C-alpha cells in the first residue's frame, strides 16, 4: 500500500543531459493495480532518434502537497496531481502496452534539464489529465458531473464520419437535463488544466490528444467537432444563440479555448508567434517568464535565436523576443503589440508586456487586430530598419507625416450612455472638420464616406477611439491615448502608421528628440504607402 511506503528520500543522482544534442529523459510507468504503489523507471534518449512516447499534461497544483512514487526503486515526492494522474492513467496505458514510456511534463525528474521544447512535435499522442473525481485534490469534480460532461460532448460531436448535425437540435434545445449538462461542462472547464500555459504544447503539437477526468475520456478531435457542430447548427437554422443564456455561455467558453488551441495549431499555415502569444494571453503561469517560454517551444526557428534563461527578468525576456522578431521577420508588428498590451512602468514604451498575468481567463480580440495589421500597406514592402544605441532605446527609420492639432472622441464607451452624449461627441467632431477645408487636402464627403465605411467594421477595441485632424488636414482615428501635438509616422516595416509622442529621458536632459510609442492609427490617404512617395525626409526616430 502507498501509505506503508517509507518517507520520500532524495532522488537518485542523474547524469547531466546532453542538451546540445537535444537529449531528453523519459519516464517508464510500470503496470499495477489501483492499490499498488506507483512505480517508474527512467531512460534517456535523443530527439533525433525519433523516440515514441506519450506526454502527460497536467496542472501542477500545490507543490507543498505531495505523495510518494517509486523511481528506480527510490521513493521520491511528487505533487498530488501528478500522483493521481499517473495512478489513473496506469490502466489506460496498460491497455496499450505492458509498460509505457511517458513524458510527465514538469515533474521533478527533468525540470531544468530541458531547455528546448520543440521535441513535442514528435509525440505519438498526449494524455491531458484534466482532473480527478475522487480523493483530496485541488482539481476535483464529482464523478457524476465528469461523466455527464464528457458524454454530452460526445453526443454533440456525433460520429466522426457523419455530416449531419440534426442531433444537435435535440441536445441544445430539447434535452430535458440540458441545465445539468451545462453545469457539468462548466465544472469541467473550470479545472486548472484549461488555464495553464504549459498545457498548450501538449494540446497543439502531438498527433493525438486524449482528455481524461477520472475514468472518463474524450479526444481533442471530438471536442473540436462538438464546437463546430454547435456553430454550424446556429448558422444553418438561422437562429441566434441566447446572448446571455447559460448554454451559449458555456459553449462560447468551450469554443474560445478550442479556437485558441486551433490558432496555435495553424502555425505551419502562416500564423506566427504573435498570434500564439495573444491566443493564450489569458492562461496562467507560476513564473511570468513562462508566458513567453511556454510558447517559444512551439516555434523552433525563433527558439534557435532566443535562449531560455530564467536568470533574465521579464523586461529582458520581452525585449529580447521583440528584437528577435524584428530581426527575423523584418516588420514592426511587435510595436503594435506594445501599444495594445497593458502598460508596465519597467518597460520602454516600444516593448510589449508579453509576461503580463491577466486575471480573467477569457482571451481577448487582439488576434483580429493582428490580422488587420497584416493586411496593411502603409510602409509598402519596406523592411524594418532598427538599431539599439543604448539600453532602453530603439532607433527606427521612417518619415514623419504630420502633427495632431485637433481630436474628438469617436463615441461613448458604454452602451448605457445617453444618445445626447453621443450626439454631442459627434457634433464636436463635425465642428472640427473645417480645418480640412482650410488646408484643402481632401474633400469633405470623401473623408466622411470612407471613414464611415471603416467605422462599420470597428470592434470593441475601438470603442474608446478618437478621430483626429493634423496640421495639414489629414483625418484619421486612433486609440484614446492620443493627445494634441502627438505626431503621425510611417516607419519602415510598419504596415500601419504609428503615433509617437515627443519625449525625454531623465538621464538625457539635453536631448529632446526621443519619442514614446503611443498607438497605431488609421489615416485617410496614406494607408497604401502614399507617405513614402511624397519625398518626406527619412529620419531615425529614437523610441524610449
Q: Where in this protein do the model-derived segments appear?
A:
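Acidic, serine/threonine-rich, low-complexity C-terminal transcriptional regulatory domains
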Residues: 52, 57, 61-97
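Conserved residues at the C-terminal ends of beta-strands
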Residues: 59, 101, 116
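Low-complexity basic/metal-binding stretches
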Residues: 94-106, 110-111
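Acidic/Ser/Thr/Pro-rich low-complexity tail/linker regions in eukaryotic proteins
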Residues: 2-43, 47-54, 62, 67-69, ...
Amino acid at each position: 500500500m502507498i501509505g506503508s511506503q517509507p518517507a520520500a528520500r532524495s532522488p537518485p543522482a542523474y547524469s547531466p543531459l546532453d542538451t546540445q544534442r537535444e537529449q531528453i529523459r523519459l519516464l517508464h510507468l510500470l503496470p499495477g493495480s489501483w492499490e499498488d504503489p506507483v512505480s517508474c523507471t527512467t531512460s534517456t534518449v535523443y530527439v533525433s532518434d525519433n523516440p515514441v512516447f506519450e506526454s502527460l499534461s497536467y496542472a501542477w497544483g500545490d507543490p507543498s502537497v505531495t505523495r510518494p512514487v517509486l523511481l528506480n526503486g527510490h521513493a521520491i515526492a511528487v505533487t498530488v496531481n501528478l500522483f493521481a494522474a499517473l495512478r489513473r492513467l496506469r490502466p489506460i496505458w496498460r491497455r496499450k502496452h505492458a509498460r509505457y514510456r511517458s513524458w510527465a511534463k514538469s515533474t521533478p525528474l527533468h525540470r531544468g534539464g530541458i531547455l528546448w521544447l520543440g521535441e513535442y512535435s514528435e509525440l505519438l499522442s498526449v494524455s491531458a489529465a484534466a482532473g480527478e473525481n475522487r480523493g483530496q485534490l485541488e482539481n476535483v469534480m464529482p464523478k457524476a458531473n465528469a461523466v455527464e460532461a464528457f458524454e454530452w460532448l460526445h453526443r454533440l460531436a456525433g460520429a466522426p464520419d457523419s455530416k449531419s448535425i440534426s442531433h444537435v437540435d435535440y441536445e441544445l434545445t430539447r434535452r430535458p437535463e440540458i441545465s445539468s449538462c451545462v453545469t457539468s461542462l462548466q465544472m469541467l472547464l473550470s479545472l486548472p488544466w484549461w488555464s495553464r500555459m504549459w498545457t498548450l504544447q501538449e494540446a497543439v503539437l502531438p498527433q493525438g490528444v486524449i482528455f481524461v477526468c477520472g475514468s472518463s475520456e474524450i479526444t481533442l478531435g471530438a471536442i473540436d467537432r462538438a464546437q463546430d457542430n454547435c456553430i454550424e447548427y446556429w448558422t444553418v437554422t438561422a437562429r441566434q444563440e441566447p446572448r446571455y443564456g447559460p448554454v451559449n455561455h458555456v459553449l462560447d467558453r468551450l469554443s474560445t479555448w478550442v479556437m485558441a488551441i486551433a490558432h496555435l495549431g495553424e502555425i505551419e499555415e502562416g500564423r506566427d508567434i504573435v498570434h500564439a502569444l495573444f491566443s493564450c494571453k489569458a492562461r496562467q503561469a507560476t513564473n511570468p517568464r513562462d508566458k513567453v517560454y511556454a510558447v517559444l517551444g512551439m516555434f523552433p526557428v525563433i527558439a534557435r535565436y532566443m535562449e531560455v534563461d530564467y536568470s533574465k527578468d521579464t523586461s529582458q525576456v520581452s525585449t529580447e523576443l521583440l528584437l528577435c522578431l524584428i530581426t527575423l521577420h523584418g516588420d514592426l508588428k511587435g510595436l503594435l503589440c506594445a501599444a495594445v498590451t497593458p502598460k508596465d512602468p519597467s518597460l520602454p514604451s516600444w516593448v510589449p508586456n508579453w509576461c503580463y498575468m491577466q486575471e480573467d481567463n477569457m482571451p481577448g480580440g487582439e488576434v483580429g487586430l493582428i490580422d488587420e495589421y497584416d493586411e496593411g500597406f502603409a510602409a509598402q514592402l519596406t523592411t524594418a530598419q532598427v538599431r539599439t544605441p543604448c539600453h532602453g532605446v530603439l532607433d527606427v527609420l521612417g518619415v514623419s507625416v504630420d502633427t495632431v492639432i485637433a481630436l474628438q472622441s469617436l463615441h461613448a464607451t458604454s452602451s448605457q450612455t445617453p444618445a445626447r452624449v453621443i450626439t454631442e461627441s459627434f457634433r464636436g467632431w463635425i465642428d472640427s472638420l473645417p480645418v480640412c477645408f482650410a488646408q484643402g487636402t481632401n474633400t469633405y464627403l470623401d473623408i466622411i464616406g470612407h471613414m464611415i465605411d471603416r467605422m462599420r467594421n470597428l470592434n470593441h477595441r475601438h470603442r474608446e477611439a478618437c478621430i483626429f485632424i493634423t496640421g495639414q488636414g489629414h483625418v484619421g482615428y486612433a486609440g484614446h491615448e492620443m493627445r494634441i501635438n502627438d505626431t503621425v509616422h510611417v516607419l519602415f516595416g510598419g504596415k500601419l502608421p504609428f503615433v509617437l509622442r515627443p519625449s525625454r529621458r531623465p538621464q538625457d536632459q539635453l536631448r529632446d528628440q526621443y519619442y514614446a510609442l503611443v498607438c497605431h492609427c488609421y489615416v485617410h490617404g496614406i494607408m497604401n504607402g502614399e507617405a513614402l512617395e511624397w519625398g518626406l525626409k527619412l529620419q531615425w526616430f529614437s523610441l524610449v
